[in-house]
Amino acid sequence: YRGVKNPVLIVAKGNDGVMPSISDGAKIYSGNVPGFDGQYVVEITDPDVKSVTISVGEVSTQFRVLNLPTPTIKIGEYWSGNEIPKSVFTNSTQLDAVIDDVNFPFKDVEYTVTQYSYMTEANGITSSHVVNGNKLTEELLKDIKKKRSGDKIMFIGIKVSTPAGPRNAPGYTAKLK
């Protein structure tokens, strides 16, 4: 995976003490990643590399390089598409970007929302308000307080910081309870 330290366990008969090598676009070194088996660590250094080859002696194995999972947005414990009580906005005053992939092995990877747009509607006119950071602004919270049960809230253009660099997240839409 790009942006994380990948654990590698190498078992190569007859090559004890031989340091593995890796193709361009990555680096390999002795070490371990907490919580994983492995005596080597691979880090991807080229953001465009699609695969890397690890070699030990005469044996080489190619590995596909994967991107980190797409960020998913939550407000409190509520996912996009959920009905969300207005009271949530008194306790949860930010957009959280999380990894919603049960097969992703790295549980300590963190994402942070860096920018979003909040869609508002007044007198039939829709407009968006760009916010830098992940906090819900006072203006936005006041707008939500005015809304009624059944009204929708929508966040678009969500930008997220990840260990592998900036990413775009899908929008967030919810209906107020």
Identify the role of each PLM range:
Residues 1, 63-90:
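Low-complexity, Pro/Ser/Thr- and charge-rich linker/hinge segments at domain boundaries
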Residues 1, 24-37, 123-143:
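Low-complexity "stalk/linker" and mucin-like segments enriched in Ser/Thr/Pro/Ala/Gly
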Residues 1-8, 92-99:
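Short coil/turn motif common to extracellular beta-sandwich-like domains
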Residues 38-42:
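Short strand-edge motifs at loop-to-beta-strand transitions and within beta-strands
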Residues 7-13, 103-105:
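Short edge beta-strand/loop segments characteristic of extracellular beta-sandwich folds
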Residues 58-76, 164-176:
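Edge beta-strands of extracellular beta-sandwich domains
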